[in-house]
Amino acid sequence: MGPNFEILSVIKVLLAKIDVIFKKGLKMWSRDSWRKFNILQQPSYPDETELKKAEEKLKTLPPLVFAGEARNLKQDLAKVCEGEAFLLQGGDCAESFSNFNAVNIRDMFKVMLQMAIVLTFAGRCPVVKVGRVAGQFAKPRSSDYEEQGGVKLPSYRGDIINGFEFNAKARVPDPNRMIEAYYQSASTMNLLRAFSRGGLADLHEVNRWNLGFIKKPDLDAKYGELARRLSQTLAFMEACGMNASNTPAVSETKVYTSHEALLLPYEEALTREDSLTGDWYDCSAHMLWIGERTRGINDAHVHFLSGVHNPLGVKIGPNATAQDIIALANALNPQNEAGRLNVIIRMGADKIGERLPKILREIKREGLNIVYSIDPMHGNTIKAANGYKTREFDKILAEVQSFFDIHRAEGTYAGGVHLEMTGQDVTECTGGSFKLSQEDLAQRYETQCDPRLNADQALELAFLIAELIKKI
């Protein structure tokens, strides 16, 4: 081989060692180093011994996802970053132990596929499907306590932490709930993998569901043309010999998982070193995000996620500045990788027009690779006259419309949408073609946290977004 080859080999080994030192040493990151930082929105467990036992148990359990899958998602999101794909992220506000069953998971999977096929056809580009599922249990709260009828108890923080029932026993944080959340997430992952490859994702079947949707009163006139054009396209593909037996893309799909990485003891315990690359991945989900309340640049959540190699999201509210986002990008994506960072805008229909354009202009000058998506739910939450927390469909749509209009005006790419939704026929958000009123909310108000779009509202929103991304 010669001396030059040997020298090059030695240099490669040294460079690899330097890279490992940089990753593990100079960054001063380990999966438990977040414990030295200021942290918000964490429960106070009464029994530290029980907490330690639960953490150690989680560390022995298999990963819920694999590093290679997270890398695949990053590659898919890189296409979104380049304007060649679209991100559809959606699911429950907060998963619960009591409502866990195969039917609910199937129905959520179905409505995501229905939305995705509409968006794919309209946008002429792949849709990256990411569920708020298989781990979306913990919820940040605006107050540490909740009061009902003069009784004050700790706030409900999600089933992974404490119980929804309003009594003193249920509201005590229990670390063993992390174990139950893990096993439920594992079961959910198993179902999602089966649904993705077991025939439920067949494009013809998904389109038939959509045709059933537009048969409902007043919907055919609005959305029928797009649905029928899609039917014609699928029929043409079939005539050309492209079917489930010879074209896997017709009957199979990929659905990734995500959740807010809020409860850091759980996330730490499921963070593993990839045997192929030596990089650390949070194997509780393919993608994690940091909430608006916990995105402090010097706080524990940003520090923890800076060290894992999953794709990451950050929720951005109306008080954020471009400098805040630039600082977060430098901390979470120092290599400026396309597909690594998703900025999720959640400003509200009344504020996005004033705040977002300036932010986009400043960030554009920095040349940062960012996937921009819109969360039109959190900034549009109101309290109805009858006491129910709700969201108006028209306000949700208005923020989505503004998001696309602003990106178009600024020459940037509106890359996706992030929704709290369900496959069930709940009555939690008002409006839509079925004109749910505040009086209707009591019929099937089932959320344990924030109001969700029901299956019809979510699909209708997809048809309306299709008009915004439509390419002739």
Where are these regions (language model features)?
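Short, positively charged and aromatic/hydrophobic N-terminal segments
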Residues: 7-12, 16-23
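N-terminal basic/disordered segments at the start of proteins
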Residues: 25-84
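Short, compositionally biased low-complexity segments
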Residues: 29-34, 43, 77-90, 142, ...
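A general structural signal for short secondary-structure junctions and capping/turn motifs
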Residues: 77-80, 118-120, 304-305, 406-410
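Short loop/turn segments at strand-loop or loop-helix junctions that form parts
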Residues: 88-93, 130-133, 374-377, 420-422
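Active-site-facing alpha/beta catalytic cores
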Residues: 94-95, 99-348, 391, 399, ...
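Non-transmembrane, aqueous-exposed alpha-helical and coiled segments at domain scale
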Residues: 340-372, 378-426
